[in-house]
């Protein structure tokens, strides 16, 4: 049995200038337990080479394709332990499958893939090959979301009776009407069905609501009734969704990328028979807790009265805001901890505190149910 202390990882996608690839690299670096040693950063040769040189990837481990990378790295004695997939949605499935079949652990951006069948296949391969598979639903990584989960699980707000959550942005507002297509790299592929899949807004941000609510409450949608607005574009830019959970509780999700004045307005509100919890992403270090008949309480990250997972994954002192990169680091803390156990011959009986391929499959099912509901007169649709 080996006793490795550090991991080796590779990346597909995430060339210089790409937003999310840089976030993943910084988050992994914060954990100080893994080194980037191989990559296929871009299908464009010049961009791939430029990024490889910047991150000091040796030439023989800078690959022209993910297929070549998976094959070569799996054959090396010092090959990568896991791969990070930060490509556009359309290639998640094929890239993840190639590395799973090569026996390499996977971390993949959401949404997991295009179809439910693809997601279930990836889940099966990972299970059969005993491989770890993280899907980076960011917001479950925030310390105060973890506190909300612990309070709800402990019954501090009583029985959950209602959920009301929103995720509002305005970065696609110029697309309304379909005649003003912006030319930023992200907006072009996000609004293209060939690259983004059957949904833009729900697939990009609505699925974050579904996953974060499920993480905090343990409740999963049973059926949905949804209205999607395309505003002249090929894919949705606005969605309003009624949700019925498996336990009969109902909720409302609203997500939009055309709400002027809202930059990244994710708000999760869980209402119980004895109180409520509310977390707002743009003020991530705070959690509002209200008990019926009592004044509101505001919990601050990093303080002595915050314990459990929220304290364990606290990086810097209170008053110094933590944000997106730290949330990703918390996800990688759990994922890389499990990968390290695997490479040392200790397969974990239970995965750590991070979203897995099963959460990714749940997200794909949610997206399909929402889109199908909207296409069918907003009727109730099974998830």
Residue ranges, per PLM feature:
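N-terminal Rossmann-like dinucleotide-binding module
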Residues: 1-57
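C-terminal helix-rich "cap/oligomerization" subdomain common to oxidoreductases
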Residues: 1-6, 84, 334-383
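Short, Asp-centered acidic motifs that coordinate Mg2+ and/or phosphate
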Residues: 38, 82, 162
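A structured beta-alpha segment of the ubiquitous adenosine-cofactor-binding alpha/beta core
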Residues: 61-80
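Beta-strand-loop-alpha-helix segment that lines the small-molecule cofactor/substrate pocket
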Residues: 82, 88-140, 155
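C-terminal glycine/acidic-rich active-site capping loop/insertion
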Residues: 138, 182, 186, 215, ...
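Predominantly a Rossmann-like dinucleotide-binding segment in NAD(P)-dependent oxidoreductases
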Residues: 139-233, 287, 377
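Glycine-rich, aromatic-lined ligand/substrate-binding cores of catalytic
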Residues: 203-285
């Amino acid at each position: 049995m080996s006793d490795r202390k550090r991991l080796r990882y590779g990346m597909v996608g995430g060339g210089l200038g790409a937003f999310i690839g840089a976030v993943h690299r910084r988050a992994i670096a914060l954990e100080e337990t893994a080194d980037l040693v191989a990559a296929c950063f871009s299908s464009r040769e010049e961009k791939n080479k430029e990024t490889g040189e910047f991150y000091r990837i040796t030439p023989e481990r800078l690959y022209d394709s993910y297929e070549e990378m998976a094959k070569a790295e799996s054959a090396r004695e010092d090959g990568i332990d896991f791969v990070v997939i930060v490509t556009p949605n359309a290639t998640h499935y094929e890239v993840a499958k190639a590395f799973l079949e090569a026996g390499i652990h996977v971390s993949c951006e959401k949404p997991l893939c295009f179809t439910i069948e693809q997601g279930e296949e990836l889940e099966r391969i990972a299970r059969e090959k005993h491989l770890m598979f993280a899907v980076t639903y960011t917001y479950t990584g925030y310390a105060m979301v973890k506190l909300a989960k612990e309070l709800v699980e402990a019954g501090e707000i009583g029985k959950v009776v209602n959920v009301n959550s929103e995720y509002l942005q305005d970065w696609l507002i110029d697309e309304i009407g379909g005649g003003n297509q912006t030319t930023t790299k992200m907006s072009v592929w996000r609004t293209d069905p060939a690259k983004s899949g059957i949904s833009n807004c729900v697939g990009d941000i609505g699925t974050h609501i579904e996953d974060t609510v499920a993480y905090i409450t343990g409740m999963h949608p049973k059926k949905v009734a949804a209205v999607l607005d395309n505003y002249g574009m090929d894919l949705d830019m606005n969605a309003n969704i009624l949700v019925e959970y498996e336990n009969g509780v109902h909720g409302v999700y609203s997500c939009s990328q055309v709400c002027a004045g809202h930059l990244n307005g994710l708000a999760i509100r869980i209402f119980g028979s004895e109180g409520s919890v509310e977390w707002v992403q743009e003020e991530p270090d705070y959690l509002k807790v209200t008990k019926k008949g009592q004044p509101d309480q505001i919990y601050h990250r990093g303080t002595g009265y915050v314990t459990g997972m929220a304290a364990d994954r606290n990086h810097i002192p209170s008053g110094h805001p933590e944000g997106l990169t730290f949330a990703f680091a918390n996800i990688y803390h759990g994922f890389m901890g499990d990968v390290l156990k695997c490479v040392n011959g200790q397969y974990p009986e239970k995965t750590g505190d991070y979203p897995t391929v099963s959460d990714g499959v749940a997200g794909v099912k949610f997206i399909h149910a929402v889109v199908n509901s909207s296409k069918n007169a907003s009727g109730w649709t099974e998830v």
